[in-house]
């Protein structure tokens, strides 16, 4: 049926979606799957999830919960067993500091925890600072809360991180929030304890809420977990929320369990909000997550996964230094992402954005990566090394061939 004869009336969508953009990481993943289904040879380095399987003990706990009939509505803020296990886990990660399980709200993934936090704390007229480059969903979630995201560019001399001077330049009387991620998606940079302390003190002095996304905390290539705001004294944390979960460290992205640790009044409000959104996270999945947090036997599996990511990080860094020495990058200290710069090719008129670079790389070499446009900086590209060493080595060879072909074309022009 032609468009002119289509009897379907025009659809008028809500203004809530007026400024909302689809997730580019999801879109690229869908395009990768489409090409693979068509028989194309595509290596996917766009994924934001570990390539490991959920640990057997965790999977069995989820199956056992189903077999035991734990499939009814759960407590809205999360089953006590999971909140208690998460509190003990977070306490151990930060040297035994007390963590109150009553201040934890379990949600359907860390993304929903961030959504709940923004909907609870921010509203029309408010501004929320977001260090850039940043995960694609932060500004979109802030907009859904009817607040205004304010991107704060990171300093290349400082692994694209921000400090209080950068934040202060972008603050005004409407600034009420800061969303921080460490280890950082998309760069893999990690804020030190001293850097976190300076940021927390700055927000506290100005009455600004800090949402600290620590979903990658366990995937850290230094000693122990990455530094956390929970390593700081209690008196600094009155306006701080911590976002955490099982997706990354325990390879449980599809189980959809995340959590927020918040001051008591905020946790209560987030729980109330959740009663009207999801009524709580999947009941069997919560039991699986409780196993992940509570079973010490899983620590060896987490350590093995982190060591595998460290090895792959080293492989990628060494390859770029040896075979693409002219390409600038951020050396990652955590997570499983590698962020490299491509705007040198803009001046040569090969491309005008990182998105075009990624499109050509996919078309010419069959490698899927994510343009920095998605993260707020169109000069860069994010690739994930959450892939097998074989695929990673093959993809690095293809990227090198692609970059060299551009350089040769420029030299002969």
How would you name each of these model-derived features?
Residues 1-13, 18-23, 28, 35-43, ...:
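PLP-dependent class I/II
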Residues 77-78:
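Short beta-strand to alpha-helix junction loop
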Residues 45, 61, 67-73, 84-94:
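Glycine-rich loop-to-alpha-helix module at the N-terminal edge of alpha/beta enzyme cores
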